[in-house]
């Protein structure tokens, strides 16, 4: 059985840091899940405003 890579849908993209498929932040080409984004956001220049 040959398994082809996904071309569309949730399983076609994964977090570039941990490999998770859920809750991806794709904006600006980040490709990070939300947990990794929250850890890395201050280092990559994102600021939290109230």
From Swiss-Prot:
Binds 1 zinc ion per subunit. The keyword 4Fe-4S does not apply. Zn(2+) binds at residues 15, 18, 33, 36. Its cofactor is Zn(2+). This is Small ribosomal subunit protein uS14. GO terms for molecular function: rRNA binding; structural constituent of ribosome; zinc ion binding. HAMAP family: Ribosomal_uS14_2_A. One of its GO terms (biological process) is cytoplasmic translation. It comes from Methanothermobacter thermautotrophicus (strain ATCC 29096 / DSM 1053 / JCM 10044 / NBRC 100330 / Delta H). One of its GO terms (cellular component) is cytosolic small ribosomal subunit. Binds 16S rRNA, required for the assembly of 30S particles. It comes from the Archaea. Part of the 30S ribosomal subunit. PANTHER family: 40S RIBOSOMAL PROTEIN S29. NCBIfam families: PRK05766.1 (NF004424). Belongs to the universal ribosomal protein uS14 family. Zinc-binding uS14 subfamily. InterPro entries: Ribosomal_uS14, Ribosomal_uS14_arc, Ribosomal_uS14_CS, RIbosomal_uS14_euk_arc, Ribosomal_uS14_sf. Keywords: Metal-binding, Ribonucleoprotein, Ribosomal protein, RNA-binding, rRNA-binding, Zinc.
